[in-house]
């Protein structure tokens, strides 16, 4: 993970800004947790300002983009958190677990350092139906299904969990993979793709082929004819999930 984000993390904070609706969903999931460790914290998006937070991030490129007045940050790996057992009320991991080299160990570490709950924002690899990957980049689905843990994986680690859906708003300002579902031209922008790890791992051959098809379909109206119904929707279910595991 550190190497990937040292490579793609330059300028990351300009595209990956916290969306207030996802921020509110995370705050609700954290409930009354007073102390939080944010693992795989990146540039610090979604770290609540109304409670004590410690960030953990392995990539120095991301650490350098954190706000000077942000939460204190420790350069470390999710696989070996440098904290005692039950050091925090809650542990938090936002769209990061799929990058961890040893997911089972990292999830166990999240549980070890939390005495209250574990909150994880992730994507369900068993979900399907996003036009971007179905029509243009099916290879991304194959890649993501190899790296994203399933809901059953979380259940095996934590036991009973609560799973909440996060439908993506049409004007989402956090530039993750599904953010631009109603703004298809955005995916043609190299700076947009640079902030999405799936594109960073793409093979040039299928990436260029998919971009060419998308560019053509947007130019001749094929995309709009096929997906006009999307403009009637303010949010879209794309498989993003918030996992909550109680440690009490």
Task: Label every PLM stretch briefly.
Residues 92:
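A conserved beta-strand element that flanks and buttresses the S-adenosyl-L-methionine
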Residues 1-37, 45, 60-65, 117-149, 171-178, 182, ...:
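Conserved class I S-adenosyl-L-methionine
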Residues 33, 88-89, 115:
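Local beta-strand N-terminus motif with an aromatic residue
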Residues 162-248:
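Conserved Class I S-adenosyl-L-methionine
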Residues 95-99:
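Short catalytic micro-motifs in class I SAM-dependent methyltransferases
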Residues 35-81, 105:
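Class I SAM-dependent methyltransferase SAM/SAH-binding core
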Residues 104-118:
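A short glycine-rich, Lys/Arg-flanked "PGG" loop and its adjoining helix->strand segment in the class I
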């Amino acid at each position: 993970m550190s190497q990937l984000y040292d490579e793609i993390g330059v300028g990351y904070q300009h595209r990956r800004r916290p969306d207030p609706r996802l921020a509110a969903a995370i705050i609700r999931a954290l409930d009354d947790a007073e102390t939080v460790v944010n693992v795989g914290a990146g540039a610090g998006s979604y770290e609540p300002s109304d409670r004590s937070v410690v960030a953990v991030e392995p990539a120095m490129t991301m650490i350098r983009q954190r706000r000077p007045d942000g939460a204190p940050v420790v350069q470390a790996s999710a696989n070996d958190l440098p904290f005692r057992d039950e050091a925090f009320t809650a542990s938090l991991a936002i769209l990061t677990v799929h990058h961890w080299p040893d997911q089972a160990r990292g999830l166990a570490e999240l549980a070890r350092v939390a005495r209250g709950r574990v909150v994880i924002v992730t994507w369900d690899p068993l979900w399907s139906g996003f036009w971007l990957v179905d029509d243009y980049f099916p290879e991304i689905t194959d890649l993501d299904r190899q790296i994203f843990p399933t809901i059953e994986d979380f259940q095996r680690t934590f036991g009973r969990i609560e799973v909440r859906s996060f439908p993506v708003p049409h004007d989402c300002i956090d530039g993750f993979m599904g953010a631009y579902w109603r703004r298809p031209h955005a995916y043609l922008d190299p700076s947009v793709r640079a902030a999405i790890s799936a594109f960073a791992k793409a093979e040039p051959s299928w990436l260029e082929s998919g971009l060419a098809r998308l560019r053509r379909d947007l130019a001749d109206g094929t995309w709009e004819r096929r997906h006009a119904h999307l403009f009637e929707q303010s949010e879209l279910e794309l498989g993003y999930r918030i996992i909550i595991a109680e440690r009490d």
